[in-house]
Curated annotation (Swiss-Prot):
PANTHER family: PROTEIN CLAVATA 3
Keywords associated with the record: Apoplast, Differentiation, Glycoprotein, Host cytoplasm, Repeat, Secreted, Signal
Entry comment describing in which tissues the protein is expressed: Highly expressed exclusively within the dorsal esophageal gland cell during syncytium formation in host plants.
GO biological process: cell differentiation
InterPro entries referenced in this protein's UniProt entry, alphabetically: CLV3/ESR
Taxonomic lineage from the root: Eukaryota, Metazoa, Ecdysozoa, Nematoda, Chromadorea
GO molecular function: receptor serine/threonine kinase binding
Protein name: CLAVATA3/ESR (CLE)-related protein 4D
Source organism of this protein record: Globodera rostochiensis
Amino acid sequence: MAKNAMLCLLILSVVLALAFATNKKDDEEPENHSTGIFGKVGRVVTVALAMSSRLGGANATRGGGAVYGRNLKSNQLPNNNWMAPPPPMAMRSAKVYDSKHSPAEYLKKFAQDFRRKTGTHSQRHHEETTLEQEKRGAPAGPDPIHHQDTTFEQEKRGAPAGPDPIHHQDTTLEQEKRVAGAGPDPIHHQDTKFEQEKRGAPAGPDPIHH
């Protein structure tokens, strides 16, 4: 870039020197003095810019790429150093672990904390389980309504199995009838007696015949 700037300055200085030299020759023509100076200066500037752009493009194609690449590498080094992550900071837990507690004590403390947390959780779980068991155990025990219905059904079933007063009375009456029929019937007994007397009378001595 510095070389390109120096070339541009040299070209501009040469062009300006030529312009002023030509202006001295044109002093005899005062009408075209102002237009001639500005016109020539403008032409010279445009030509100088065109030449400098061409020279800059040629230098860039020849070796500017390598220079540009070197500049990038040189710029990347400080950027990489600047973007590098900071060194890892020592953790607070590591300090406590190294200074105050040994590995066994640290593990023991961790186990105690874990048991404490899980113990509260297990106690709550045990209380909930006990409550559920009580709820489930209540219907498993004697239900007063169900027990009362069962007792009433058993009484109903037990009543016909025992002596029914009406049925027992009918059975007793039938038994009395059967016993009465089995025993001596007074009417039938009287008829039988009379027939026996009739039969026994001719068998014995007839008082008239006798």
